[in-house]
């Protein structure tokens, strides 16, 4: 039972880590004066697609190693 709790906690931590990295990327995009609003939105949409795939990979992971692999694929 503790293994399951640890896995759930590891998944939550991994998703939080990924979310922080994504937010940093989005902030950089927003601060870039060389991009149009349309370009910024296109980049953010693509990043959010990748984020969703990453969350799915983390949610489907059955071990901490698989969680790390899912994070690394982002």
What are these regions (language model features)?
Residues 1-74:
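Amphipathic alpha-helical assembly segments used for oligomerization, scaffolding, or translocation
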């Amino acid at each position: 039972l503790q293994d399951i709790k640890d896995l759930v906690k590891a998944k939550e931590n991994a998703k939080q880590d990924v979310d922080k990295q994504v937010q940093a990327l989005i902030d950089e995009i927003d601060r870039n004066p060389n991009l149009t609003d349309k370009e910024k939105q296109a980049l953010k949409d693509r990043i959010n697609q990748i984020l969703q795939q990453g969350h799915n990979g983390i949610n489907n992971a059955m071990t901490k190693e698989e969680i790390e692999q899912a994070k690394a694929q982002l």
